[in-house]
């Protein structure tokens, strides 16, 4: 792995500082580094140390993309690097994430292992969401975590009809509807009472948000199923949110169609780390009360 792209959470001073230090370290390892113009400016990175590319092209020609930030930064970067099929490594800046599972303190040792070939690559399922209107298709969007239909500013219920592979499954009144990947099962869907799905399983979750009828429970369907739903009531201020980062207004008559994408995200993991360790730490299973985390960065001399 000789060409490394960096994606930085620009609102996080720790991530900016880490980007600067990592760029210098990678140069000492004789790796070619690429950063965004915004990150180069924020971290004061010399053009001699890194090439500059727009975020949407950061994966082009790279052997690895490293995301410095949180899960939200990782999800945004995932869509940008998807077309390049480049593996991604997530580094968290203080809080363990389900996607950014490597801590800053572990980063350098972890990268040495990666450069030595000691790593696993896991393909994460993605979804493709479509909105179909009488005027034609108005949206096609790749999603790593979830697609959520919900009300906008007012806390009111929605009514929708859900079908799978053209077969009607249920009609529900609820605060909204979540369609999630296994990766997204630990996101909004988990907060809405959905199950945790191992990321290697080929399945899609359909999860009503606070349904009016308690018998409307989350269901998991095969990954090759096509899920579609329509809103059955004429009400304003309805949105379709994609990975919690893009919102699209919904109109009367819209049909939302969701299916497994023909693309997947390649995520790098240490073979010494397992998914259940991350669940236990992130969800505080059997954690000792009062445990504190050291969020400080190590001095460069300690690496």
UniProtKB/Swiss-Prot annotation:
Protein location: Cytoplasm
Family matches, as InterPro entries: ATP-NAD_kinase_N, ATP-NAD_kinase_PpnK-typ_C, NAD/diacylglycerol_kinase_sf, NADK
Keywords annotated in UniProt: ATP-binding, Cytoplasm, Kinase, NAD, NADP, Nucleotide-binding, Transferase
A Pfam family that the UniProt record links to this protein: NAD_kinase
UniProt binding sites for NAD(+): 71-72, 145-146, 156, 173, 175, 186-191, 245
Enzyme class: transferase
A GO BP entry: NAD metabolic process
GO CC field: cytoplasm
Catalytically driven reaction(s): NAD(+) + ATP = ADP + NADP(+) + H(+)
EC annotation from Swiss-Prot or TrEMBL: 2.7.1.23
SUPFAM superfamilies attached to this UniProt entry: NAD kinase/diacylglycerol kinase-like
Cofactor: a divalent metal cation
Function as written in the Swiss-Prot or TrEMBL entry: Involved in the regulation of the intracellular balance of NAD and NADP, and is a key enzyme in the biosynthesis of NADP. Catalyzes specifically the phosphorylation on 2'-hydroxyl of the adenosine moiety of NAD to yield NADP.
Family to which this protein belongs: Belongs to the NAD kinase family.
Designated name of the protein: NAD kinase
Organism in which the protein naturally occurs: Magnetococcus marinus (strain ATCC BAA-1437 / JCM 17883 / MC-1)
Record gene name: nadK
